[in-house]
């Protein structure tokens, strides 16, 4: 992993990664939809980690906020965590990767650390019930962003994550 602050690009399957990434990586700020901050207790806890909260209905404005605030957080020494699918997906069925995180990387020159996991197998989305088992987390090599366009960075990180996901168990045994 890079020594300097980086942008973590990861698939999003459950609440598990939002909790456990805090134990794996240095101080982080998450990109999230603004209305998550309005949830009593949960949202207040999220706010303590200096997230980048966006209004997803205003895409151009959201991208401007992400780049501006992302640069600030990186300058403060915080790592950014971005789930480019934009929402939780089912194991074995990753969603379309949006390029916001790659755009921040391209404009700041910060490295991207791709991360793949299968947390949704044991912590299904929209379910209070959790299942026992071992969640696999694979941290990829840093993708340098200097002199690269966002599209290339996005393709590299998405390709790496999708390749890993094909090798991880997508259902409980």
Predicted regions and their residues:
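Non-catalytic C-terminal accessory region of glycerolipid acyltransferases
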Residues: 63-173
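Catalytic core of membrane glycerolipid acyltransferases/transacylases, capturing the structured
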Residues: 3-59
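Short low-complexity stretches enriched in small and charged residues
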Residues: 2-11, 36-39, 67-71, 91-98
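A short acidic, often aromatic-flanked loop/helix-cap motif at beta-alpha or helix-coil junctions
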Residues: 1-3, 38, 59-62, 143-149
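N-terminal start-of-chain detector that recognizes signal peptides
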Residues: 1-4, 24-26, 52-54, 84-85, ...
């Amino acid at each position: 992993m890079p020594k300097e602050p980086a942008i973590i690009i990861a698939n999003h399957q459950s609440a598990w990664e939002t909790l456990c990434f805090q134990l794996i990586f240095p101080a982080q700020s998450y990109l999230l939809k603004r209305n998550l901050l309005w949830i009593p207790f949960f949202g207040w806890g999220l706010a303590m980690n200096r997230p980048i909260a966006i209004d997803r209905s205003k895409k151009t404005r959201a991208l401007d906020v992400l780049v501006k605030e992302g640069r600030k957080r990186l300058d403060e020494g915080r790592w950014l965590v971005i789930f480019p699918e934009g929402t939780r997906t089912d194991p074995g069925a990753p969603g379309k990767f949006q390029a916001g995180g790659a755009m921040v990387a391209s404009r700041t020159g910060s490295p991207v650390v791709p991360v793949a996991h299968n947390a949704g197998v044991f912590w299904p989305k929209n379910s209070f019930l959790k299942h026992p088992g071992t969640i696999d987390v694979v941290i990829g090599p840093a993708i340098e962003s200097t002199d690269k366009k966002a599209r290339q960075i996005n393709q590299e990180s998405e390709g790496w994550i999708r390749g890993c996901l094909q090798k991880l168990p997508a259902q409980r045994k």
